[in-house]
Amino acid sequence: MASQSSVAVISSAAARGESFPDSKKPIGSVRFQQPLRLSFSYCKSGNMSSRICAMAKPNDAETLSSSVDMSLSPRVQSLKPSKTMVITDLAATLVQSGVPVIRLAAGEPDFDTPKVVAEAGINAIREGFTRYTLNAGITELREAICRKLKEENGLSYAPDQILVSNGAKQSLLQAVLAVCSPGDEVIIPAPYWVSYTEQARLADATPVVIPTKISNNFLLDPKDLESKLTEKSRLLILCSPSNPTGSVYPKSLLEEIARIIAKHPRLLVLSDEIYEHIIYAPATHTSFASLPDMYERTLTVNGFSKAFAMTGWRLGYLAGPKHIVAACSKLQGQVSSGASSIAQKAGVAALGLGKAGGETVAEMVKAYRERRDFLVKSLGDIKGVKISEPQGAFYLFIDFSAYYGSEAEGFGLINDSSSLALYFLDKFQVAMVPGDAFGDDSCIRISYATSLDVLQAAVEKIRKALEPLRATVSV
């Protein structure tokens, strides 16, 4: 069964303290290419439940003929699978097989797309607006994006400085590919969104990861940044509000970072602002391009998925210097062409809801804040758990490392974020993403883009899961 092979991939890695291995077995919608070479110590010891264990030997039907060279390129083989996708798909397959799972892994709003936005897409279909558009995006949408950037962010762009893409992820990748050369360094504060490091590798660049501290709200220390910059430094990726931590960079800190960047002529900034509207007062959002002398150095990426609950519409955009945007457009023309005509019409309607999404988005943010407050208080009361209160987005990045080294009866040793996440999933049916996927193995990410009732049930399960572990560690 899919659910069996899915969890087996994770369980074997956790048992050995390794990242998820390659596999020819399917994990939901994800399929890896190398045969499983696993030691199923958890399964053999009887610690794992029967639904979790799967055979390590690939099916004969999946074995390729040795007479045909079906090898993959080194570029693809160097990439790591997204653990967010692995956990999300795994939880879904378990649910489909009849196992109830509380799913807190996916970074997807639980709200419906606003009705007026959905109607705009439906009307586009009814009116026959279903053909190719300009590669860069329809003029109406790019003009609306320019107005948004001017009114909300204080940034002046012309439509030819905007590139609409099939989601912000595509915008980010194209920006990295457009400005990075082999051997360049991409500076990435950790914890980071899972795709940043892999996108750098796709450009034959070297990701340079700078750890941050929970005691500093996971914010980049300017001194640490300065110590890592070299002549090879080409791109700094910043995400505020942050996925996975929810941290928001105050303007004063961004100004410090900008002063350091100004000393390095080759260094550009890729500012991921996809969670811009999901922010909790008194925190405020500052676009990096609005800082002194940073306009020409900054590539701003944003989109519609998070704020407007439009994840399935696949619509994002890049704003930046004209020649870089043109280069990204050239890439897009060879990769996907323009974004969906229907989604673009919906995007125009979304930007017409008012500043920061108007009352519609404000109601969503109000609900997210209520959920955040509940989780911070409820989980913060658990002994040994450390939390930095998020100021934006809809994630908690929780430090559970005090429980590493514990022994769980009927499970085994818990020595890292992967084994702890597996323990939560296998024994208590709560799906969360291990922190090592984001470059910080001390934590686990919880998405609170779900109902308060579900979160209350999750907290009770997490409490029960941690209770028996306390006896085996000094918490």
Swiss-Prot record:
Q: What is this protein called?
A: Bifunctional aspartate aminotransferase and glutamate/aspartate-prephenate aminotransferase
Q: Which cysteines are joined by disulfide bonds?
A: none
| Protein purpose | Prokaryotic-type aspartate aminotransferase. Also has a prenate transaminase activity. Involved in the aromatic amino acids biosynthesis pathway via the arogenate route. Required for the transamination of prephenate into arogenate. Required for early development of the embryo.
Task: Give an example GO molecular function.
Answer: glutamate-prephenate aminotransferase activity
What is the similarity comment for this entry? Belongs to the class-I pyridoxal-phosphate-dependent aminotransferase family.
Q: What is the lineage of its organism?
A: Eukaryota, Viridiplantae, Streptophyta, Embryophyta, Tracheophyta
Cite the residue span of the transit peptide: 1-55
Required cofactor names: pyridoxal 5'-phosphate
